[in-house]
Amino acid sequence: MRTLKSLVIVSAALLPFSATAFAADAIQEQPPVPAPVEVAPQYSWAGGYTGLYLGYGWNKAKTSTVGSIKPDDWKAGAFAGWNFQQDQIVYGVEGDAGYSWAKKSKDGLEVKQGFEGSLRARVGYDLNPVMPYLTAGIAGSQIKLNNGLDDESKFRVGWTAGAGLEAKLTDNILGRVEYRYTQYGNKNYDLAGTTVRNKLDTQDFRVGIGYKF
């Protein structure tokens, strides 16, 4: 009986120490809390933008009197547009206006391009921080013919299509490269009583820089 009583007293005395050791083990076995990970905000192409471009055009003017003339030269202008974004699909509308210095003569007939502009739809795919895109729409340009005796200038309307790559340089600054093909169709010019039929196609490569609002 005395031995049993002694065991009970010893067990009661050791119980607090056992509970403390068990609690310490339980605390030590808890996994560490992971540090919070900062997620960079996703860039959005949505919204308005404007910018400037510089390019070079390789043109081909077919005429009914002297055949083909190739008035190649530099061009420059401005563009502006508005984007919408649905997941990774970016779409919107863009317009541009500029001036082409393309001019060349053949056998006394000169073809000269001046003002040019377009209004186009644009659709791209977000590959943050770049966006490849396709574009197409209507185009217009002032085109002048001169045969030395007379000249006539007409505003021509046609279509344009192309592709490009836009890149986010900063949160607001955009850079781009773009290829465009434009066709202005056929038009008759009356030069000193001679009817000259002209068709003009242009291919140009442009680089641009823009600001996103």
From Swiss-Prot:
Gene Ontology CC annotations of this record: cell outer membrane; host outer membrane
Protein's cellular compartments: Cell outer membrane
Entries under SUPFAM superfamilies matching the protein: OMPA-like
Main location: membrane
Signal sequence annotation: 1-23
Pfam family, one: OMP_b-brl
Family per similarity comment: Belongs to the Omp25/RopB family.
Entry protein name: 25 kDa outer-membrane immunogenic protein
Source taxonomy: Bacteria, Pseudomonadati, Pseudomonadota, Alphaproteobacteria, Hyphomicrobiales
Gene: omp25
